Amino acid sequence: MSDNLDLVRSIYADWERGDFRSAEWADPQIDWVMADGPLQGTWTGVAGMALGWREWLSAWKDLRVEVDRYFELDEGRVLVLTRGIARGAASGIDTGEMRAESANLFHIRDGKVTRLVIYWESRDRALADLGLEG
């Protein structure tokens, strides 16, 4: 297993425990990108990523991320197919459980994630963007 894959696995170990605060793995100028979903955009830097995470996480309670599969790609990239399971927190109304088949694309250089693209609603879009089949 490569160092890049080990790094991404360690990030998911944190996320699977609900720890979305640690950022030792992130390059100081990371681009954190939400490609789709209710919160779309790009946040730059560790502070920007933290702001994006806070905005994103405030919409959900009991968010869990489960990994289906890891793919080590070329050029320091790792694609992870995931499932997100959560309950909506907006307006205090229980919206029921939400499930999403998602994908996250990590760009890694010198042991740090320089770009993280989150495809919350469509792993098929991630696969298509990368020229892979779903």
Where are these regions (language model features)?
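C-terminal and inter-domain tail/linker signature
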Residues: 1-134
